[in-house]
């Protein structure tokens, strides 16, 4: 039995963990088990969720305890989920603008509220006014469609293109950096933005996220 051997083995395990799973080691420093190497976003959004902010709080505490570490921040966008998410956001923006015009409101579309009662009629008007291939009835006119089907077709019609997705990925990274500076009290000199990119969702690994790496 060798105490020195046990200490050496623990030391080796820590080194291996620091190399293979640095964020797991970082989380354990502040008594947390959460995966800190990424933070997820809702499809089409670059606004941090409550759970995302809680994760950044943990990450900020860990970085405070290790002032020599620097963080690389890389925004990602899922070609499928985020493209559809951007399409839904554009659809809702147009619906709110339509209501504002109809009611004579001189306000931005984000400030317009659409009630559940108003929504189907506004959606139908938007669907009818957009120029894209739509399902036809037996005499060649556009078919009357259920709300869910119109939403799906309009989201596909307005779906984000590659440039939109890259822009979304970069905005996510910037949102994370801003949060860490303003609310996490992390020095800007320790935070580095990397170019945004596309990442497909694989299993439980969502593509609509921001990835972190340590320097």
Give the location of each predicted region.
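Extended terminal
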Residues: 1-206, 215
